[in-house]
Every structure is written in C-alpha cells, then in structure tokens.
C-alpha cells in the first residue's frame, strides 16, 4: 500500500490497456459462460469459512448444467461464429487464480487476449478441452485463442457477463 501511495506521489505513471464493455470499463477480464458467476454468486459466509475452497465447491455445482451460447465474435482479423460454453477477453497473466491461461501478455500493447471455448459434442471432446487447458495448448478445434484490438460480440439470447469479477449485466444483441 505504501509503494502504491509513493508511486502516486512521485507521479510515476504505468500505462495499461483498459477495456470498454458498452458503458462500463474493465482492466482485468470480461467473461461469460461456465464458472464466470462463481466469484459473485459464492456466499460471503462460505468464503470466510472455506476461503478458496468455497469457489471450487461453487464451481463444481456448475458442471451439472453447462449452458452454451450461440455467438458471433467479430474482430479486425475476421469473424468466428459457434456455440460457446465460455469466453474471456482479458489483459492478465492469471484469471480466477489460474496462472498462465493466456500467453505473451503485454498489459500496454493495445491488445486483449481472447479465449473462446466451443461447446463439446460429447464427453471425449470435454476431456480434450480439459487436457488442452491443463497443458496450456490454447489453439485447437475446441478452443480459440487470439489477440484483438477490438471485438464485437453478438448473441441470440441474453448472456450474463462478469467484469473484473463482478456482475457486469446481461447482454443480448
């Protein structure tokens, strides 16, 4: 805390990318889908008692009801349209306590790291997704991973988003 105050007093400026989500901003992550509501849906009492394990237990409940969203994601490099169970636009080396989910992160390059996970069609594809995530193999037929300066996300239904770990509202286009 003292270091932060000292930096402010010295006017040392650290520039970093900030995202815009409609009328809101985010510095860390904008995400939808599987597990993204865990940070704000886990009860404070449970967090106080169990700490990080509270998030794990709350997340485990989500595995019984995996919802997919049909979306069209447009960037300066093209269009991706598919059914996704998870997506994140981030500017961080770790998300939700998981380190190195994104690679080659530069927090002031004007680019965001994007990860989109396609709805698996069967248990083998779900296993492949988990294996790829654990092995940090981020580009496959089931996981899109890329950098983008700007994204437009369109969905056929309302989709709940989290912005920097807080509820960011539901959007449909």
List each language-model region with its residue ranges.
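Small-residue-rich beta-alpha loop regions that form the catalytic core of phosphotransfer
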Residues: 1-53
């Amino acid at each position: 805390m003292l270091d932060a105050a000292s930096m402010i007093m010295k006017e040392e400026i650290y520039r970093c990318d900030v995202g815009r989500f409609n009328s809101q901003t985010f510095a860390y992550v904008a995400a939808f889908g599987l597990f993204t509501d865990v940070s704000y849906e886990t009860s404070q009492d449970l967090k106080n008692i169990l700490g990080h394990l509270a998030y794990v237990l709350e997340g485990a409940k989500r595995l019984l009801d995996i919802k997919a969203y049909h979306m069209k994601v447009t960037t300066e490099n093209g269009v991706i349209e598919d059914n996704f169970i998870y997506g994140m636009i981030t500017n961080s080396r770790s998300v939700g306590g998981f380190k190195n989910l994104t690679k080659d992160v530069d927090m002031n390059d004007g680019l965001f790291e994007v990860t989109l996970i396609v709805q698996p069609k069967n248990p083998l594809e779900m296993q492949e997704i988990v294996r790829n995530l654990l092995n940090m193999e981020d580009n496959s037929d089931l996981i899109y991973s890329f950098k983008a300066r700007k994204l437009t996300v369109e969905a056929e239904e309302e989709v709940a988003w989290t912005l920097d770990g807080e509820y960011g509202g539901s959007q449909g286009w």
